Amino acid sequence: MTPTSDATTMTTPAGAAAPRVGFVSLGCPKALTDSELILTQLSAEGYQTSKTFEGADLVIVNTCGFIDDAVRESLDTIGEALAENGKVIVTGCLGAKAGKDGGNLIQEVHPSVLAVTGPHATQEVMNAVHTHLPKPHDPFIDLVPGAFGEAGIKLTPRHYAYLKISEGCNHRCTFCIIPSMRGDLVSRPVGDVLKEARALFEGGVKELLVISQDTSAYGVDVKYRTGFWDGKPVKTRMLELVQTLAEIAEPYGAWVRLHYVYPYPSVDEIIPFMATGRVLPYLDVPFQHSHPDVLKRMKRPANGERNLERLQRWREICPDLVIRSTFIAGFPGETEQEFEHLLQFLREAQIDRAGCFAYSPVEGAAANEIPGMLPLEVREERRARFMAVAEEVSTARLQKRVGQTMQVLVDKSVGLGKKGGVGRSYADAPEIDGLVHLLPPEKASKTYKVGDFVKARIVGTQGHDLVGQPV
């Protein structure tokens, strides 16, 4: 496996051979932000990154442990790094997972790793690095401040970035082990979040993706206390955070996109603000299922029976609203009737972008004890049926875009044709949604620049994507 891109290459004092660190980041955007913090701190202390395991003095692997496939990938990557380098520090969600004998899983499988930490453990990782690869001393580099709360090294393209507003989760969904690895909800101080956001916009970010385990619950742990930003009071709450982010983004013409938003009644307050256009009318809402009995077995928060009603009300207020969601098919005990209820919900809710997992037992999850585990072939068959309906809904909604003029953020400068491009509209988050394939501009001299916004008339569809002609 190739370590993280050399976009993170760090400067070294003249004449000094700086120690080199290989880095691999696995898992979700929340893990990616942890990686960015570690890499920023490494840079601040004068370490360099290596493109290869062999060329590094040691390797850091940031792991994922949410589902079995992710566990296997993480363990395989650690093994590869050990084979090619021999000195490996492990961090991330898998680092907090116990093995069969009650000890640490990673140390049971790979006892030669140098150190293991859980997620969101920048200082612990740095302590391990200092132990096994002492940092170079430089009087100028040593004055660089710490990275937390500031915009440091980013692993995303320059024009978009993830902004993590909290760590952990207060829910105990039966299929999930994240709280056991990342702990209960801890909201970042609102002033730190806003400071990082402004630094990102100043650095050229055109799209800010707000992430957490539960964005809607931001501030619950601190009882929505009032913080300060630019000398003004700002409540530690999702609505006030989003309003202030929009205010900061406006001079830069940048987008603000919300992810992991649970359908609490408090989200109703955000929708009118989305209708003004100051924040993208896009919500990533993890519904997981629609049937009340399945939701109870899942121990999902919020009132699932009213989700359809809530969605319809949101779209009445904000007709341009796009909903992305993820679901689980074949959860233990799911009957055919309950699954049909889910398919009907998908049709009626008109979910723009839907993903689905066939239920897979996760070691340590309470759902493993629920009676009625379905055969794998039934779970996979239901996932396939779900995705067929999801594609029908998505295709119909995409077709309605034909003839519209949309703002597109350019991700690639070469696409369909010699001077075409690829970008995304407000309806598409990076990596998980569709694209807008931009046809070559009518003026031969005009080209697309990554990170620019262009207006495009939608002239067709292409699978999950749109095709646009610049105007």
From Swiss-Prot:
State any GO CC term: cytosol
Q: Which domain of life is it from?
A: Bacteria
Which cofactors does this gene product need? Answer: [4Fe-4S] cluster
Give the principal location in a single coarse category: cytoplasm
What is this enzyme's EC?
Answer: 2.8.4.4
* SMART domains to which the protein is assigned, alphabetical: Elp3
Instruction: Identify a single GO molecular function assigned to this protein.
Output: protein methylthiotransferase activity
Q: Which SUPFAM superfamilies match?
A: Radical SAM enzymes (SSF102114)
State the CDD domains in the record: Radical_SAM
Q: How is the cofactor bound?
A: Binds 2 [4Fe-4S] clusters. One cluster is coordinated with 3 cysteines and an exchangeable S-adenosyl-L-methionine.
Q: Which family does it belong to?
A: Belongs to the methylthiotransferase family. RimO subfamily.
Q: What does this protein do?
A: Catalyzes the methylthiolation of an aspartic acid residue of ribosomal protein uS12.
Name by which UniProt lists this protein? Ribosomal protein uS12 methylthiotransferase RimO
The organism of origin for this protein: Delftia acidovorans (strain DSM 14801 / SPH-1)
Primary gene name: rimO
